[in-house]
């Protein structure tokens, strides 16, 4: 988790300096309990400095609600939110639906298409770190040369 504006700015500057490719950002902003983890200024810096240089961001529903300023209750809301985030930030959005939408269906929104990845919810109290694991796997697949949709699917 990147928790301060200064750290977010430094990371964005270094990624740009080194011309990093295949940047995958899991914008950790909300704890599993629902508590906000970032101050408002850090969220603003994240939205202005780091997320726009990402290839894809992987927010969960509470994080997407913060990024787009709308409530998400349905799959149609997920599409509208992902579109709003894409249009605001200019990067692909993998909106993870495991929080409060039917089952655990994820939505990939890109310039070219909208893709659904259907999943079944597994009730397990030990889910801490699953979003970070997913974003790391996507980054690894992109680094191997797979396109974004295949990287998410794998």
What feature does the model see in each segment?
Residues 111-123:
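Glycine/charged-rich beta-loop-alpha catalytic/anionic-binding loops adjacent to active sites
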Residues 66, 124-148, 152:
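Short, small-residue alpha-helix embedded
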Residues 17-18, 87-88, 144:
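Alpha-helix C-cap/termination motif
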Residues 3-11, 42, 46, 74-81, ...:
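General structural feature for long, well-ordered alpha-helical segments within catalytic domains
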Residues 1-52:
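Glycine/small-residue-rich loop that forms an oxyanion/phosphate-binding "nest" at active or ligand-binding sites
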Residues 40-114:
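Conserved phosphate/ATP/ADP-binding segment of small-molecule kinases
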Residues 29-31, 97-99, 121-123:
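Glycine-rich beta-alpha junction loops
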